[in-house]
């Protein structure tokens, strides 16, 4: 039996399918009001905290009032994490960016 490289196309496809399966499971959990217990089961406290920090990073990048360095100091996140968020936001589809702006910048916190 040959071991597949962690970078092979087959492994990448399998990981993508696993991700899509998780997304479908999460959608079903939302429909049945089980999303919070599911996310608590699937994510460690550190992972949940990291997701919350990433939402704040995206929110502040969209707001555009702080430099990446200021964000780093305020949120305690690494500059690489903030840079990845910035780069991801730049390559995000326009519809997603518009939705994020509407959802994160105009909603009550």
From Swiss-Prot:
Sorted UniProt keywords: Cytoplasm, DNA-binding, Repressor, Transcription, Transcription regulation
Alphabetized SUPFAM superfamilies for the sequence: TrpR-like
Subcellular location: Cytoplasm
Any GO BP annotation: negative regulation of DNA-templated transcription
Main location, first listed in the record: cytoplasm
Cellular component, GO, one term: cytoplasm
Location of the DNA-binding region in this protein: 68-91
Tree of life domain: Bacteria
Entry function: This protein is an aporepressor. When complexed with L-tryptophan it binds the operator region of the trp operon (5'-ACTAGT-'3') and prevents the initiation of transcription. The complex also regulates trp repressor biosynthesis by binding to its regulatory region.
Subunit structure, interactors included: Homodimer.
Protein's name according to its UniProt entry: Trp operon repressor
Organism: Klebsiella pneumoniae (strain 342)
Lineage: Bacteria, Pseudomonadati, Pseudomonadota, Gammaproteobacteria, Enterobacterales
Gene: trpR
């Amino acid at each position: 039996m040959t071991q597949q490289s962690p970078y092979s196309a087959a492994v990448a496809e399998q990981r993508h399918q696993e991700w899509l399966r998780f997304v479908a499971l999460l959608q079903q959990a939302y429909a049945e009001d089980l999303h919070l217990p599911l996310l608590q089961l699937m994510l460690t406290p550190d992972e949940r905290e990291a997701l919350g920090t990433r939402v704040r990073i995206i929110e502040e990048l969209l707001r555009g009032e702080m430099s990446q360095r200021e964000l780093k100091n305020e949120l305690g996140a690494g500059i690489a994490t903030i840079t990845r968020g910035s780069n991801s936001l730049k390559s995000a589809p326009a519809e997603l960016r518009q939705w994020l702006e509407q959802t994160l910048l105009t909603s009550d916190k």
